[in-house]
């Protein structure tokens, strides 16, 4: 038989397992505080599985109320290009959901600084080479996480469903 302390461990473990594969596209859930207000233990009917399932069901019932979202990594991107390619790069950054923060002129080249979601720059080296006749270069540095725009969440969830059913 389980002790009351063991049931608390199983409830916690059930919640942790549920949070590791969240409701939106299976990504982990972060920034959640959970408080157990009521739970009972019975020598005959209580077991590990029942407590884990109870924690999972409690979280699933709470999800519509907490309005989960998806976060994405944002990078600071510095692009150095010849003056003739500045317009092309600025337009491209806009297409990639980037926010241009500034530009610095240096001896015939411009350094463009922008914040761009990682998903939009995964193949940027190849694209930059094509846009600048192989003369541009860039660097990137992780900054923070931000919420994915609402219009993209449904697409991400749908793609994850396809991937998870294979």
Placement of each model-derived feature along the sequence:
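Short, low-order "capping/linker" segments at domain edges
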Residues: 115-123, 148-166
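Glycine- and Gly-Pro-enriched alpha-helical subdomains that act as flexible
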Residues: 38-74, 78, 83
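Beta-strand elements of well-folded, non-transmembrane domains
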Residues: 17, 36-40, 83-85, 118-120
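Interdomain boundary/hinge elements
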Residues: 25-33, 63-80, 99-117, 134-152
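Residue-level signature of catalytic and energy-coupling elements of molecular machines
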Residues: 11, 32, 79-82, 93, ...
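Conserved P-loop NTPase/AAA+ ATPase motor core
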Residues: 11-25, 29
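Single conserved hydrophobic/aromatic residue that forms the stacking wall/gate
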Residues: 1-6, 10
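Hydrophobic side chains in well-ordered alpha-helices
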Residues: 89, 124-127
């Amino acid at each position: 038989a389980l002790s009351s302390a063991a049931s608390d461990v199983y409830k916690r473990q059930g919640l942790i397992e549920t949070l590791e594969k969240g409701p939106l596209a299976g990504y982990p859930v972060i920034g959640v505080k959970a408080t157990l207000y009521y739970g009972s233990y019975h020598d005959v009917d209580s077991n590990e599985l029942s407590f884990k399932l109870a924690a999972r069901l409690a979280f699933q019932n709470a999800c519509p109320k907490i309005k989960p979202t998806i976060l994405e990594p944002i990078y600071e991107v510095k692009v150095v290009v010849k003056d003739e390619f500045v317009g092309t790069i600025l337009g491209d950054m806009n297409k990639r959901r980037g926010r241009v923060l500034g530009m610095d002129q240096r001896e015939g080249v411009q350094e463009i600084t922008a914040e761009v979601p990682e998903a939009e720059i995964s193949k940027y080296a190849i694209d930059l080479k094509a846009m600048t006749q192989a003369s541009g270069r860039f660097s990137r540095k992780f900054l923070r996480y931000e919420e994915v725009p609402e219009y993209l969440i449904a697409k991400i969830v749908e793609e994850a469903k396809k991937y998870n059913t294979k």
